[in-house]
């Protein structure tokens, strides 16, 4: 099952939700503002990152700049507490399943969450369209 970690006021989060719904992809929504990440969720997210906290912390956020801290120096429990108290520190949306994670909304990258059969069918249709258009040139 896909989990969409979001904040309702975030434009990219709304785009991700709309895209998943439009493509009939089942997902569970988790509002990180009203229900901050627990330790297991944070550890799971971190396990998918290539650059650790650098991938998930929004360094451009007002909260981050106001705190003026080096998150790499924090222990896991301190980081957990900091994110729990300041959920807007996280880049959003975070889209996660058992095999992959995407941070932010990117229409090309989010396609990885479509079932393989769906992607094959779309590729087949695109190929047919390209062949038809090629005959008209």
UniProtKB/Swiss-Prot annotation:
PANTHER family named among the record's database cross-references: ARSENATE REDUCTASE, GLOBAL TRANSCRIPTIONAL REGULATOR SPX
The organism's taxonomic lineage, starting at the top: Bacteria, Bacillati, Bacillota, Bacilli, Lactobacillales
Keywords on record: Cytoplasm, Disulfide bond, Redox-active center, Transcription, Transcription regulation
Subcellular localization: Cytoplasm
Family, as annotated: Belongs to the ArsC family. Spx subfamily.
Name recorded for this polypeptide: Global transcriptional regulator Spx
Presence of the UniProt keyword Disulfide bond in the record: yes
An annotated GO cellular component: cytoplasm
Gene assigned in the entry: spx
Disulfide bonds: 10-13
InterPro entries given in the database record: Arsenate_reductase-like, Spx, Thioredoxin-like_sf, Tscrpt_reg_Spx/MgsR
Function (record text): Global transcriptional regulator that plays a key role in stress response and exerts either positive or negative regulation of genes. Acts by interacting with the C-terminal domain of the alpha subunit of the RNA polymerase (RNAP). This interaction can enhance binding of RNAP to the promoter region of target genes and stimulate their transcription, or block interaction of RNAP with activator.
Assembly information from the UniProt record: Interacts with the C-terminal domain of the alpha subunit of the RNAP.
One of the Pfam families matching this protein, by short name: ArsC
GO BP, sorted A to Z: negative regulation of DNA-templated transcription
Segments forming a coiled coil: none
